[in-house]
Amino acid sequence: MNFKQAYYEEPIIKDIKSSNTFSLSEQVDESILPENLKRKDLELPEVSEYDVVRHYTRLSQMNYTVDVGIYPLGSCTMKYNPKFADRVSAIDGFRNIHPFQPENTVQGALHVMYDLQEYLKKISDMDAVSLQPMAGADGEFTGILIVKKYFEDKGEDRTEIIIPDSAHGTNPASATMGGFDVVEVPSDDKGMVDLEALRAAVSKKTAAFMITNPNTLGIFEQNIEEIAKIIHNAGALLYYDGANLNAIFGITSPGLMGFDIVHFNLHKSFATPHGGGGPGAGPVAVKSFLKDFLPVPIVDFDGNSYRLNYELKKTIGKVSSFYGSFSILLRAWSYIIRNGDDGLKNVSARAVLNSNYLKKKLEKYYDIPYYPLKKHEFVLSTENTGKRALDIGKYILDNGIHSPTVYFPLIVKEAMMIEPTETVSKADLDNYADVLIEALKLSDEELKSRPKNTAVRRIDEVKAARDLKLKW
């Protein structure tokens, strides 16, 4: 596919001014307000609707999204977001309600939230769910606060959270924000948690072990039941990072594996929108002995009506305003209903199939370390090729498709982490493999000159790191 991305010298919206976009035809009587109370400039729109639409359309043409093509960022599950879910979230009966309305006037919305809680409980084999957290990382931090409050309630001084060396970066960040010290354990030669290292790390100070399964190498932690036994025998909790839940729908579940706390990434596994600083949703599920620690409110049903329950005795309190990101909860609810049990199982089966098909096409050209059987994603290394992962990633962009995650996980040198998801076609996968193979035929000099066809070419990464500009 020939590709040349659009480029505009586009100002930010606040710097755009349209001339003569607003006028008043009527004469306004002289104001009786004293001079010191009069506004000198009226806060009237300065940009016409036409100019606003043009502005954001031009920006979209300089962007890349899941609607444009394959977006195989490892551990991000950049699947296509089905548009029927957008239509559901735009129904007037949902869109026009207000969180301050009496409960008896929003029974439909509460019904949806209750159903979603029940669906997530069933999918994860957990006992209670809060929909409060507004993003995956927010859900993860909420889970850590539950861990903290649980041991405070028991009167136990547990100060450490254990994580594997393949963990997501949010895991140590959330643990640290929660006031815990982070202890890292290494992977074994198969890319799984080293059980002996875990046994050595566990102590009376251990509050929890955080892990995702399959892990960030795309490998299923086959010893998860033994891991659960080690952690629980130490009196600690087992925490499931739901980043890779998309690989196991209908096959196994966090509850069956022995986890005590789970956070869901609705923008990953349940196909709600990614990025842009929001919207997001990261519900948290727990086993029954932790239910009273959940953030409030949760939605209850007494057989006749739905209500918001603020009466959990040991709750960590609220972690967001109102009742979570309702429009995103609607989309996830719609996605689950549309797919059903069999459909969700097929989602995972196709995600695993697509990942292994692409891996098989690339393994003759790139090193794919650790245990050979992969799930929904895999990590290859460019080290054996003499090429840099960064340079190959930039070349991929020049072909109108998105690069994988590069340089993560850190335990693989020159890593490229690839998660195609279930929504891409065989033709997409074949083309992606061809581009990765073609990259190896180019000289280092040619690779370093890429991308040439994107709106933004290579940035000065050293300058960007040293001279941060995070606001206008």
UniProtKB/Swiss-Prot annotation:
Domain of life: Archaea
Obligatory cofactor(s): pyridoxal 5'-phosphate
This protein's encoding gene: gcvPB
A single cellular component GO annotation: glycine cleavage complex
Pfam family membership, one: Aminotran_5
Source taxonomy: Archaea, Methanobacteriati, Thermoplasmatota, Thermoplasmata, Thermoplasmatales
Biological-process GO terms, alphabetical: glycine decarboxylation via glycine cleavage system
Catalytic activity: N(6)-[(R)-lipoyl]-L-lysyl-[glycine-cleavage complex H protein] + glycine + H(+) = N(6)-[(R)-S(8)-aminomethyldihydrolipoyl]-L-lysyl-[glycine-cleavage complex H protein] + CO2
Assembly, per entry: The glycine cleavage system is composed of four proteins: P, T, L and H. In this organism, the P 'protein' is a heterodimer of two subunits.
GO molecular function terms listed in the Swiss-Prot or TrEMBL record: glycine binding; glycine dehydrogenase (decarboxylating) activity; pyridoxal phosphate binding
CDD domains according to UniProt: GDC-P (cd00613)
Protein name per UniProt: Probable glycine dehydrogenase (decarboxylating) subunit 2
